[in-house]
Amino acid sequence: MRVALYNLEPEIHNSALMQVSQYHKQKGDDVCMYSPLYHNTYDKIYAFSLFDFTDKGYVTPDMITGGTGFDIKSRLPKEIEDCDLDYSICPDCDYSIIWFSRGCFRNCPFCVVNEKEGYIHSVEPKNLNPNGRYIKVMDNNFFANPNWKSAVEQLHEWNQRIDMQGFDIRLFNEEQAEVISSLKYMYTFKFAWDNPRDNIDDKLDLLVDTIYNRKLMCYVLIGFWSTPEEDLMRVRHLWDDYGIDPYVMPYNKFDEYQRKFARWVNNKVLFKTRTWEEYQDGYINSKEEYEAHLRVKERRSNHNEIPFDF
């Protein structure tokens, strides 16, 4: 059987895609990445998507679809879920994708994790990438895992650098700080501050005092629980008072304010050189506006006028 795998977000390495590949290769099937030019040559096509806003225009009725981008409650069949990951299908993937737990004990109304994966529970980690340079720990809330200490022991045993995707700052304590300091890390240590009504200053104090040798980044949700004033307060408080890099996550990516605010904060050159008020005054919304702005600057410069600087 000739099986094709269609990843609708090719910039993201999809672990489910790798498990489907492993399953079919174990059965002796020929597995490859999907190409529309050879559509009629495939016996079976799997299409994967993580996000509902991803364009599905090239998905055809004969494809087997999966992922939250198609159905929030979609699941892999158990015989595929039990398979290891076939990293060879993604040769540019230079890290291992590891879960020690699934689900979450919280039920935040903006998040699909609890609905999709249920209450937090431990899972056995899959195989490491033989060509991986580091381990990406995908747990939604690492320290909420009832067996997080066993997970730490496994990470020490693997002895590779780690990119941990996130943890709940509200649970953070001195024991966890000691554990984090003992682990090898790569890139940035990440956590979230979703609700501006959560006073997390004592946790931030502990974090910067104990994880001083790591770059810290905080995901800041906007457009759900917060006002624009609270959004600005959080990003300024994180950066000005703690030196923690804020990264804005818009709840509605199509909302003009949320898109504009995220662009300002997440572009660190803009965030560190302009106030929010200054950025709004000089906001450029598109490539066309930017090119028009450059033409105006050039004309003014030619007439010895003071050019507008965005």
Regions found by a protein language model. Give the residues of each.
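A structural motif corresponding to the C-terminal lobe/cap of the Radical SAM core domain
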Residues: 188-190, 197-310
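Acidic/glycine-enriched edge-of-secondary-structure segments
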Residues: 11-31, 107-112, 163-166, 189-196
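A short, structured N-terminal alpha-helical element that caps or precedes a catalytic domain
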Residues: 1-62, 71
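Core AdoMet radical
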Residues: 6, 46-49, 112-207, 214-225, ...
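Short, well-ordered alpha-helix to beta-strand connector turns
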Residues: 28, 41-43, 60-62, 94-96, ...
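N-terminal [4Fe-4S]-dependent radical SAM core
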Residues: 1, 53-57, 63-101, 105, ...
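A structural preference for short, hydrophobic beta-strand core positions in alpha/beta folds
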Residues: 30-36, 65, 164, 218, ...
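A general structural detector for well-ordered alpha-helical segments in enzyme core domains, enriched
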Residues: 20, 56-59, 151, 175-179, ...
